[in-house]
């Protein structure tokens, strides 16, 4: 095997696979290096297996520091550790997000290539509409839940991926023929050299320490990049690799005796989305309304997540203004200019709890759930090194719910979830909320303090990490690391602000956009 390539890609995740495919098919020599294995076993490929992949060898199983916003709990945070990355272990959600988010991103960094109109072609390039839901995969509670959303005052949105997700609409997934579509299968890697089960120790630089020249693995093997090194390890692991390579905050690197190459705020600006879930007891579980019931047994129900509707809602304006004033957010901030998709509310026909939640129920067909996801967190944390050992886990401090703006948003979403189940349509099938032991059921009229206490028990990561090598401070608008040459970061680390959606679709689009930049050189 050659040790020299035009491009060396560090991380065989979603974006890494896109870049390796596009560059190699265009005739460039490409080495794609992944820390985990290449695996397509049934546990990975099944659409309903994702909850059971947490804690396995196919994930980086990380823990946050104790989070004051979550009752001083440490909660799990996961990232894919296999060829395909998180596209190989995620829940298959396919959401582009809100056009306003992309337009704000472009304005903030001063480059219109990142606005929604320009990113749309990259979404479309990676998408193929293969089907709508098969008639046999219509769940028993489809109409009662739809009617509840209407009764709760939510507007129907037939295309939440059309640039404005506000309202409620169909839940969109990217399974094909009842199988996962990992990036390494969806994109042709036949012309790329793929190296799995290989951990990168550092990015190498030339003698003046200004130009990236390749990488060194933990076993000492070195590979040379004659054009560029592309870092695509994901928002949790990319900052670790950069800092181990001398790219990061000078004072922090000095603590670990790492020679500085570029003093940049790597690991800062860390944002992640949290979720809080309600469980609802069914009036007639014997009718087969939920996963775990013997009558919830159509084969088509295993073709995707047991979810049909998703709502995206803004924080009520008066509450938003009050909270942002408390946080001293400038009135000109784009966050305040238009209604944004602050929170997502789903109804799952199973008691789906977030990773790290202290309250769980068995999947025995007696309960459904409402996951509430904070889509646009304003809280910021940081990722740091625990040591200079590349096999050690980084230290994650996301700062969950540090701002009143975030607390107001998650409360607003929780009230929507409660209001849904207080409608007459929902009450026909729902007996009520099952709260954590020792707690009373909540209502939409409960106090803010009641909601805050609940989040401290059930709040957990939704595994949508970003911002740790942010565009504008760490990389430029072409994802090139500042202060050095021939080094780019191409993953959710570059998202200086969150997007109101799940990051799978945006990361595919990001990969396509960066591939176009490289091929245009």
Curated annotation (Swiss-Prot):
Its cofactor is FAD. Its EC number is 1.1.-.-. It comes from the Eukaryota. The keyword Metal-binding does not apply. Keywords: FAD, Flavoprotein, Oxidoreductase. One of its GO terms (molecular function) is oxidoreductase activity, acting on CH-OH group of donors. One of its GO terms (biological process) is secondary metabolite biosynthetic process. FAD binds at residues 14-15, 34-35, 82, 90-93, 492, 503-504. Pfam families: GMC_oxred_C (PF05199), GMC_oxred_N (PF00732). Pathway: Secondary metabolite biosynthesis. Disulfide bonds: none annotated. Belongs to the GMC oxidoreductase family. GMC-type oxidoreductase; part of the gene cluster that mediates the biosynthesis of aculins. The pathway begins with the synthesis of 6-methylsalicylic acid by the polyketide synthase (PKS) acuA via condensation of acetate and malonate units. The 6-methylsalicylic acid decarboxylase acuB then catalyzes the decarboxylation of 6-methylsalicylic acid to yield m-cresol (also known as 3-methylphenol). These first reactions occur in the cytosol. This is GMC-type oxidoreductase acuG. The gene is acuG.
